[in-house]
Amino acid sequence: MPRYLSLFKYTPEARKGFVKEKAAAREAALKLTIESAGGKLELFNWTVPGSDYSGVTIAEFPDASTYTAVFALVKATGAFSEIKAVELLTASEIDRGLGTWGLVAQADKIVT
């Protein structure tokens, strides 16, 4: 399953609610959301005050469409001023890609 790293930043209003609800409640809510979509929350960490982002997550999803749906749902809450995400690749996925690149590089010699 594809894995995604997300950096998130709360809005000022959401930070106020965060103090009231506590970190564990926010983590539990996200875990439930991801699991209900067939994914798995692997990491949920907060950053120190003064950082550019409020926290970071790593989660696994069945596919990119599922990730996109969860991302849109979370963003629609209005609690985040910014969310940046990247898909993570394993060494074997990179190696497979490099193998494909070799085939593509040869294709330009074939198609003229």
Task: Please annotate each region the language model reported.
Residues 1-36, 40-42, 47-53, 65-67, ...:
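Short S/T/G/P-rich N-terminal loop/turn motif that feeds into the first structured element of a domain
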Residues 54-60:
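Short cationic amphipathic helices and targeting signals
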